[in-house]
């Protein structure tokens, strides 16, 4: 049942054979694998098999060991150097403080042009104050919606209303009087329509 797969020229040497997975699972004798031009004999293993990377030779382990030793030595040598660094002379310390003082950023007086970037005041566009000539403090404006007055006559009418009082309250024209009869209300709603032309042939 084991099927053999022939490896192409790109993957390995021509003529080398690689056993399929079925052959490895069934344990059909030793098989030859072509890996990077090397031939390795693998014995059949039962159960699940996982391809583990090959063990590194001892030479590479020695190289890694020497690298680790070198880094340990360098870490050890850095310790005493750090202890020697704080011993500076007084002249060097004073030079550093002078440099730090000279590197302080300049004050705001050195850049007066920054204030001129915004030539207008944004609050000017949000002012809702009226000039002193038009006083509206004595007008009954509670609950009045915003009105746009086209003519000055309407503005004069508003000024003539006088101070608000609970006794003299003018009834607004859009509210209907409750004492009126329904017929009088309906008479105000009648609209004259044009006469119907009956002469048109359908």
Curated annotation (Swiss-Prot):
Q: Where is this motif: TEK-box 2?
A: 94-96
Q: Which residues are modified to Phosphoserine? A: 165
Cellular compartment(s): Cytoplasm; Nucleus
Q: Which UniProt keywords apply?
A: Acetylation, Cell cycle, Cell division, Chromosome partition, Cytoplasm, DNA damage, DNA repair, Mitosis, Nucleus, Phosphoprotein, Proto-oncogene, Repeat, SH3-binding, Ubl conjugation
* Record-linked InterPro entries: Securin_separation_inhibitor (IPR006940)
Motif (D-box) spans which residues?
61-64
Question: What positions does the record give for the motif labelled SH3-binding?
Answer: 163-173
| Span(s) of short sequence motif TEK-box 1 | 71-73
Give the protein's biological function: Regulatory protein, which plays a central role in chromosome stability, in the p53/TP53 pathway, and DNA repair. Probably acts by blocking the action of key proteins. During the mitosis, it blocks Separase/ESPL1 function, preventing the proteolysis of the cohesin complex and the subsequent segregation of the chromosomes. At the onset of anaphase, it is ubiquitinated, conducting to its destruction and to the liberation of ESPL1. Its function is however not limited to a blocking activity, since it is required to activate ESPL1.
Subunit note: Interacts with RPS10 and DNAJA1. Interacts with the caspase-like ESPL1, and prevents its protease activity probably by covering its active site. Interacts with TP53 and blocks its activity probably by blocking its binding to DNA. Interacts with the Ku 70 kDa subunit of ds-DNA kinase. Interacts with PTTG1IP.
Q: Provide the protein name.
A: Securin
Specify the species: Pan troglodytes (Chimpanzee)
Gene name, please? Answer: PTTG1
